[in-house]
Amino acid sequence: MKILLANPRGFCAGVSRAVETVEKVLEVEKSPVYVRHEVVHNKVVVDSLKKKGVVFVKEVDEVPDDAVCIFSAHGVSLKVEEAAAKKNLVLYDATCPLVTKVHRGVRLASNNDAECILIGHKGHPEVQGTMGQYRSKKGAIYLIESEEDLNKLTIKDPDNLYYATQTTLSVDETQGIIQALKDKYPNIKGPKKEDICYATQNRQTAIKAMLKHIDVLVVVGSQNSSNSNRLKELATLEGIDAYLVDNPKDVDKLWFDNKKVCGVSAGASAPEYLVQQIISQISKVCSTEVEEFEGIKEEVYFPLPRLLKQKIGTGKVE
């Protein structure tokens, strides 16, 4: 059986920045270092950081006053920021800059008393943080996941309306909802460029290009990773068997019975070393040759948080 490796795959610039932020903070600050929420949605990465002394918490209420705390790549609400300030925490913000961009758009809508529609998955930490940017008493923010949700929605002022999206959604699915939004509310405003991040788009494009060449897909990523689940869905929608794994032990020999070509990709929060471990496991259960599938080369880099750059002396505080 041949293995085709999708390109690009794995860590994006926002995840790399978040993980590096935690590792560098461990070097420059005294333990313990607290992180609100999983810094990225990958069990292997989180477990590795726990072993290095990171304490993961659900809320800043669990962090002692004056302690060191890091916000995850998914971002937080204004209430969480205020709670952290009251506790006088030494705060490092690892929010992905592309999520921060979405936050700015929602805050601007709030400041203009515009109602806001957010396309995203209920309960996802990024969505919670984005919803929590809205403060207007005159307007409101609404969360929708589908065109069906949109059809049920009642807006007070369609002429003062803004939309935003979670960054890790399916590009195809979101385009349909956005078009439906524009059809229903012709005067709706939104970001100049769609909020779906470059890494999400690139990884989905890579899978689509590979689909006609494979008959089974393995996506390296955790079950709670939104973007990893979207990659898996692209294959299943085309009738191709697809599996989401974050541990080599999860690989099942039966997946590859009568299969000729296995595609392998990884969500934006899955490290390359884990991809290689899973490829090795696939090779153990069936004879394979591995080939890189040509794709987009990513060269995006996000600098570390300003406070951290100041502490380690690698950059000027702007």
Swiss-Prot record:
<keyword id="KW-0414">Isoprene biosynthesis</keyword>
<feature type="binding site">
    <location>
        <position position="12"/>
    </location>
    <ligand>
        <name>[4Fe-4S] cluster</name>
    </ligand>
</feature>
<dbReference type="Pfam" id="PF02401">
    <property type="entry name" value="LYTB"/>
</dbReference>
<feature type="binding site">
    <location>
        <position position="227"/>
    </location>
    <ligand>
        <name>dimethylallyl diphosphate</name>
    </ligand>
</feature>
<feature type="binding site">
    <location>
        <position position="226"/>
    </location>
    <ligand>
        <name>(2E)-4-hydroxy-3-methylbut-2-enyl diphosphate</name>
    </ligand>
</feature>
<keyword id="KW-0411">Iron-sulfur</keyword>
<feature type="binding site">
    <location>
        <position position="167"/>
    </location>
    <ligand>
        <name>(2E)-4-hydroxy-3-methylbut-2-enyl diphosphate</name>
    </ligand>
</feature>
<feature type="binding site">
    <location>
        <position position="225"/>
    </location>
    <ligand>
        <name>isopentenyl diphosphate</name>
    </ligand>
</feature>
<comment type="function">
    <text>Catalyzes the conversion of 1-hydroxy-2-methyl-2-(E)-butenyl 4-diphosphate (HMBPP) into a mixture of isopentenyl diphosphate (IPP) and dimethylallyl diphosphate (DMAPP). Acts in the terminal step of the DOXP/MEP pathway for isoprenoid precursor biosynthesis.</text>
</comment>
<protein>
    <recommendedName>
        <fullName>4-hydroxy-3-methylbut-2-enyl diphosphate reductase</fullName>
        <ecNumber>1.17.7.4</ecNumber>
    </recommendedName>
</protein>
<dbReference type="GO" id="GO:0051539">
    <property type="term" value="F:4 iron, 4 sulfur cluster binding"/>
</dbReference>
<dbReference type="GO" id="GO:0051745">
    <property type="term" value="F:4-hydroxy-3-methylbut-2-enyl diphosphate reductase activity"/>
</dbReference>
<feature type="binding site">
    <location>
        <position position="96"/>
    </location>
    <ligand>
        <name>[4Fe-4S] cluster</name>
    </ligand>
</feature>
<feature type="binding site">
    <location>
        <position position="124"/>
    </location>
    <ligand>
        <name>dimethylallyl diphosphate</name>
    </ligand>
</feature>
<feature type="active site" description="Proton donor">
    <location>
        <position position="126"/>
    </location>
</feature>
<keyword id="KW-0560">Oxidoreductase</keyword>
<keyword id="KW-0408">Iron</keyword>
<comment type="similarity">
    <text>Belongs to the IspH family.</text>
</comment>
<feature type="binding site">
    <location>
        <position position="225"/>
    </location>
    <ligand>
        <name>dimethylallyl diphosphate</name>
    </ligand>
</feature>
<dbReference type="GO" id="GO:0050992">
    <property type="term" value="P:dimethylallyl diphosphate biosynthetic process"/>
</dbReference>
<feature type="binding site">
    <location>
        <position position="227"/>
    </location>
    <ligand>
        <name>isopentenyl diphosphate</name>
    </ligand>
</feature>
<feature type="binding site">
    <location>
        <position position="226"/>
    </location>
    <ligand>
        <name>isopentenyl diphosphate</name>
    </ligand>
</feature>
<keyword id="KW-0479">Metal-binding</keyword>
<dbReference type="GO" id="GO:0046872">
    <property type="term" value="F:metal ion binding"/>
</dbReference>
<feature type="binding site">
    <location>
        <position position="41"/>
    </location>
    <ligand>
        <name>dimethylallyl diphosphate</name>
    </ligand>
</feature>
<keyword id="KW-0004">4Fe-4S</keyword>
<dbReference type="GO" id="GO:0019288">
    <property type="term" value="P:isopentenyl diphosphate biosynthetic process, methylerythritol 4-phosphate pathway"/>
</dbReference>
<feature type="binding site">
    <location>
        <position position="124"/>
    </location>
    <ligand>
        <name>isopentenyl diphosphate</name>
    </ligand>
</feature>
<feature type="binding site">
    <location>
        <position position="124"/>
    </location>
    <ligand>
        <name>(2E)-4-hydroxy-3-methylbut-2-enyl diphosphate</name>
    </ligand>
</feature>
<comment type="pathway">
    <text>Isoprenoid biosynthesis; isopentenyl diphosphate biosynthesis via DXP pathway; isopentenyl diphosphate from 1-deoxy-D-xylulose 5-phosphate: step 6/6.</text>
</comment>
<feature type="binding site">
    <location>
        <position position="41"/>
    </location>
    <ligand>
        <name>isopentenyl diphosphate</name>
    </ligand>
</feature>
<feature type="binding site">
    <location>
        <position position="225"/>
    </location>
    <ligand>
        <name>(2E)-4-hydroxy-3-methylbut-2-enyl diphosphate</name>
    </ligand>
</feature>
<feature type="binding site">
    <location>
        <position position="197"/>
    </location>
    <ligand>
        <name>[4Fe-4S] cluster</name>
    </ligand>
</feature>
<feature type="binding site">
    <location>
        <position position="226"/>
    </location>
    <ligand>
        <name>dimethylallyl diphosphate</name>
    </ligand>
</feature>
<feature type="binding site">
    <location>
        <position position="269"/>
    </location>
    <ligand>
        <name>dimethylallyl diphosphate</name>
    </ligand>
</feature>
<feature type="binding site">
    <location>
        <position position="74"/>
    </location>
    <ligand>
        <name>isopentenyl diphosphate</name>
    </ligand>
</feature>
<dbReference type="GO" id="GO:0016114">
    <property type="term" value="P:terpenoid biosynthetic process"/>
</dbReference>
<feature type="binding site">
    <location>
        <position position="269"/>
    </location>
    <ligand>
        <name>isopentenyl diphosphate</name>
    </ligand>
</feature>
<feature type="binding site">
    <location>
        <position position="74"/>
    </location>
    <ligand>
        <name>dimethylallyl diphosphate</name>
    </ligand>
</feature>
<feature type="binding site">
    <location>
        <position position="227"/>
    </location>
    <ligand>
        <name>(2E)-4-hydroxy-3-methylbut-2-enyl diphosphate</name>
    </ligand>
</feature>
<comment type="pathway">
    <text>Isoprenoid biosynthesis; dimethylallyl diphosphate biosynthesis; dimethylallyl diphosphate from (2E)-4-hydroxy-3-methylbutenyl diphosphate: step 1/1.</text>
</comment>
<dbReference type="InterPro" id="IPR003451">
    <property type="entry name" value="LytB/IspH"/>
</dbReference>
